[in-house]
Amino acid sequence: MRLSDRDIELWIKNKKLVIEPIPNKELIHGVTIDVRLGNEFYTFCNKFNKNIDLSKSRNEISKILKKVMNKKHIIPNDHVFLLKPGMFVLAITLEKIFLPNNLVGWLDGRSSLARLGLMIHATSHRIDPGWGGNIVLEFFNSSNMILSLCPGMLIAAVSFEILSSPSIRPYNIRKNAKYFNQSEVTFSRIDQD
């Protein structure tokens, strides 16, 4: 069962669901809470051989990832990041979200942005029970236009669903919780699988 706007407000008030900064009621609608774009972006190095061979050893994959993912951009609040056609970048939400063990979150892009060709997440829209941190966004511009993205703009919406029972293996207690408590754009850690 998904939380309604009333339930989202109650869960935040009772600190069962932690969102920092605490959202204004204007950001909570129906069954979602709007999240805003942070100011950190990572782009991929264009000068590198673009083949990432995932069949290689962890160590070899790690070396390749360090070469290809190395351009961090911090955009001031009154500036924009230009997302060119066909460009894939990682970005981050302004909000930090911490889920309890009995709640799963779902990240969805905004329809108005999708109609301009902006994809918010490549495949990973589930936010696991026990997960916490800033959400890393996987932007792709599928249009033929440059899209200007401004820190603080509404970028996505998150809904929350109550589990049938609390998870016995929530994200925050896993040995390999690679992305727990992330506060900046975090590269792929596929080399840690």
UniProtKB/Swiss-Prot annotation:
Active site per UniProt: 138 (proton donor/acceptor)
A Pfam family of this chain: DCD
Alphabetical UniProt keywords: Hydrolase, Nucleotide metabolism, Nucleotide-binding
Catalytic activity: dCTP + H2O + H(+) = dUTP + NH4(+)
EC number: 3.5.4.13
BP terms from Gene Ontology: dUMP biosynthetic process; dUTP biosynthetic process; nucleobase-containing small molecule interconversion
Disulfide bonds: none
Annotated dCTP binding sites: 110-115, 128, 136-138, 171, 178, 182
UniProt keyword annotation of Hydrolase present: yes
EC class of the enzyme, as a word: hydrolase
Domain of life: Bacteria
GO molecular function, one term: dCTP deaminase activity
Protein's pathway: Pyrimidine metabolism; dUMP biosynthesis; dUMP from dCTP (dUTP route): step 1/2
Family recorded in the similarity comment: Belongs to the dCTP deaminase family.
Quaternary structure, from the entry: Homotrimer.
PANTHER family registered for this protein in UniProt: DCTP DEAMINASE (PTHR42680:SF3)
Protein name as catalogued: dCTP deaminase
Organism annotation: Buchnera aphidicola subsp. Baizongia pistaciae (strain Bp)
